[in-house]
Curated annotation (Swiss-Prot):
The gene is ND1. This is NADH-ubiquinone oxidoreductase chain 1. Its main location: mitochondrion. The lineage of its organism: Eukaryota, Metazoa, Ecdysozoa, Arthropoda, Hexapoda. GO terms for cellular component: mitochondrial inner membrane. Its EC number is 7.1.1.2. The keyword DNA repair does not apply.
């Protein structure tokens, strides 16, 4: 019984902590963007604007929920809920030593969840019955599918090297040298692919304000918009965590792990404040003509390395 209840309590605590982390990540983003644009950012609610995320949450969830007249009601309603559910479930493959739900196929579970995330965006865009939302949804789907290929290949190359699908093994393999040092190009490709996966600047075509008003979530108000927002920032935090686990290998119980995670999340925000939006055709060329060959080359290199080491043994 204890074995059944403890993972449940652990996962519930994890979800609550992720939610609080997302709340303060939004505050950090607004503050950092404020200082980048030479202004203060939110500083009225609480001490130095510390309670701003909570007042935002109250405001969003108490506003009136509107439903477009010609929308597909059930799909429209469930898409944000499913989106948030997926981005929280994906945290279950976080490599805990207590084996929360950190099963041996954690990498495959991550790939499955990111692939499913495409459907929520597509359904949200389609069921709104708005041209802007549909265009945003289609862009997001094409973009996510393109960049998932390079993400999967990068993960596959490390799996060949490590020989295991469990994220926990990434620590033991990086006790002497971090992967970022001998796979620096792969690290950059991974970071850019993460930006594209989470629909962040400079790849935020799904919600290109200058072209599509707000993209696939244009018809969502109050609670629905808040859920989509939470899902997006939760996936940003998760991608930062994954970057730290794969490339900056550190023990999840050390304080340095959290410093690194905060730094990578800060890089996401920094990129948003610095870079303009990319051109859509160049985004696709980048995925298929630059990232794909690079990650394939590394994959062959790692396979060759593994075969070479095995041949030395026998």
């Amino acid at each position: 019984m204890f074995d059944k209840i403890m993972p449940l309590i652990g996962s519930l605590l994890l979800v609550i902590c992720v939610m609080v982390g997302v709340a303060f990540l939004t505050l950090l983003e607004r503050k950092v963007l404020g200082y980048i644009q030479i202004r203060k950012g939110p500083n009225k609610v609480g001490f130095n604007g510390l309670l701003q995320p909570f007042s935002d949450a109250v405001k969003l969830f108490t506003k009136e929920q509107t439903y477009p007249l010609l929308s597909n009601y059930i799909s429209y309603y469930f898409s944000p809920i499913f989106s948030l559910f997926l981005s929280l479930v994906i945290w279950m493959c976080i490599p805990y030593l207590i084996k929360l739900y950190s099963f041996n196929l954690g990498v495959l579970f991550f790939l499955c969840c990111t692939s499913l995330g495409v459907y929520t965006v597509m359904i949200a865009g389609w069921s709104s019955n708005s041209n802007y939302a549909l265009l945003g949804g289609l862009r997001a789907v094409a973009q996510t599918i393109s960049y998932e290929v390079s993400l999967a290949l990068i993960l596959l190359s490390f799996i060949f090297l490590i020989g295991n699908y469990n994220f926990l093994n990434f620590y033991s393999y990086q006790s002497y040298i971090w992967f970022i040092f001998f796979c620096f190009p792969l690290g950059l490709v991974w970071l850019a692919s993460c930006l594209a996966e989470t629909n962040r600047t400079p790849f935020d075509f799904a919600e290109g304000e200058s072209e599509l008003v707000s993209g696939f979530n244009v018809e969502y108000s109050s609670g629905g918009f808040a859920l989509i927002f939470l899902a997006e920032y939760s996936s940003i935090l998760f991608m930062s965590m994954l970057f730290v686990v794969i490339f900056l290998g550190s023990d999840i119980y050390s304080l340095m792990f959290f410093f690194k995670l905060t730094f990578i999340s800060f890089v996401f925000i920094w990129v948003r404040g610095t870079l303009p939006r990319f051109r859509y055709d160049k985004l696709m060329y980048l995925a298929w003509k630059s990232f794909l060959p690079l990650s394939l080359n590394y994959l062959f290199f790692f396979v060759g390395l593994k075969i070479f080491f095995i041949s030395l043994l026998f």
